[in-house]
Amino acid sequence: IIAVSKTFPMSEINPLIENGQIHFGENKVQEAVDKWSDIKKLNKNLKLHMIGKLQTNKVKYVVPLFDYIHSLDNIKLAEKIASEQIKKNKNLKIFIQVNIGNESQKSGINISDLKNFYEKCTKELNLKIVGLMCLPPQHGLVKNYFDEMVELKKKLNVEDLSMGMSEDYLCLLYTSDAADEVRR
């Protein structure tokens, strides 16, 4: 479980760390830099996940601080991440965001473009794509979208799925090969 720590002060996060929570999610780069830069230097076990929309101009701040990106959704961003990783000599674990419901208001790679995008990211840009991420539509049967993500995971032979939010937790329990990462 990724503890979503966005908007919470360190005074509320520290008890989680003291009790063994190591994976934390942030969606605002500047807030994360201010909050986590010093504590991550002191505690190398902590893993920080970028769970929000990432703009290319923020990548230079994300690569040195974060360990995971859950929102890779376009080739320009992929190229910027690849370039910055070379500069910083660091390889993040990256999830491709899939627009599983084909919703115009949501970011993400369309299913029909996913295989080509994945291959470009892994073969040409040498990105470490560890999984797929989706935020399912609020309408319809969420489980069907999760099942479709499981099939996409198998087709691409990636390790992990990052799917859903706290309210999707029970549904994920009943999904075959459910999410490896859940934001709570």
Regions found by a protein language model. Give the residues of each.
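Conserved alpha/beta-domain cores
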Residues: I1-D160, M165-E167
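Single conserved hydrophobic/aromatic residue that forms the stacking wall/gate
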Residues: Y174-R184
